[in-house]
Amino acid sequence: INEKYELNTPVTSFYSFKGGVGRTTATVLSALLLARQGKKVMIVDFDLEAPGLASIFANRSDNAEELLSVNGFVDFLIDFEFNKRDFNKINLDDYYFRKNEQALVGSNGGELFIVPAIATNSENSINYINKLSKANIRFGLGKDYAPDIFLKKMEEKLKPDHILIDTRTGINDVGGLVFNRY
């Protein structure tokens, strides 16, 4: 895969070869800084094997269980395949949640759109491994890659000023695809 996939929005991927260095924290703090400057920021958790982005925002939240039950990128992969790649059967509102509380993002009109890797509430966590094993990041042949399709559709819907991606630690297919494409 040599071609870059073009989005209209700047994309920043956060990566570390070693785990436990604060990559997710750096992603969240960068998003908050941008939001406090009045920017609309989409944060995507592509750490599919160890998702944690949604839980940072759910922690100490009155609606924590609701936030953790929002579907994520893995759920999109499965739903998209199940619906035979028909976007008319997909509701993108199911794959993110919005945070715009002034105490969090400031008073300049900034917003955060958080795309979890997968729904991680107590009900869905039982099916996590099963869902992850069925997720297919590549659709068909050629240039049809799930992150390309998903990010483009989310960009069209949310019109963010920035897209921040929290990738998985180490050398892996998702991280390689994200770095090569964006």
Question: Residue spans of the language-model regions?
Answer:
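N-terminal pre-Walker A segment at the start of P-loop NTPase domains
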Residues: 1-2
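P-loop/Walker-type NTP enzyme "switch/lid" segment
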Residues: 48-155
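Short acidic, S/G/P-rich loop/turn micro-motifs used as interaction or catalytic elements
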Residues: 20-21, 121-123, 170-172
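Conserved catalytic-core segment of NTP-binding enzymes
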Residues: 37, 144-182
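Generic beta-strand/beta-sheet core signal
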Residues: 44-47, 115-117, 165-168
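Residue-level preference for the first positions of well-ordered beta-strands
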Residues: 11, 40, 112, 161-164
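Walker A/P-loop phosphate-binding motif and the immediately C-terminal alpha-helix
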Residues: 5-55
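An acidic- and aromatic-residue-enriched active-site/binding cleft used to recognize and process polar
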Residues: 17, 46-49, 58, 168, ...
